[in-house]
Amino acid sequence: MADIGPSFAAHAYRVRSSAFDLLALEDLLGKEASNYVNKYLRLKATFIYYDFDKLITAADPDARPPLLDLANRLFDSFEKLQAAVTTKDDADIGSCYADTKLILQEVMTRMA
């Protein structure tokens, strides 16, 4: 990870805490809470996007490709999960969330 001073810790912490919050979202998945889940996912994705942008921009050129790959996989997964939540198909939501969960755990490990 690039060290961009005091703000690095703040950006990495917010990425980590947003990922943790999204991991806790598993209990709410389902048709009843789909509107809430969709809004919460968009909110947390916005925070993560902003902080990843700051971290990637400040990273050394050699450290950027792994961060870009991780961010791209995460946001692709978010898009699939959001589409599944919108359709309210429980099987699809579970499948997409399982994929997203693995990437979120990787994000938490990388930002530690």
What positions do the PLM features span?
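Short, solvent-exposed, charged loop/turn and helix-capping segments
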Residues: D51-L68
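C-terminal amphipathic alpha-helix
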Residues: G5, D76-A112
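Alpha-helical segments in soluble extracytoplasmic regions
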Residues: A2-I56
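Short coil/turn residues that cap or connect secondary-structure elements
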Residues: L29, A33, A59-A63, V85-D89
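Short, charged, amphipathic alpha-helical segments
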Residues: N38-L43, R64-N72, A91-K101
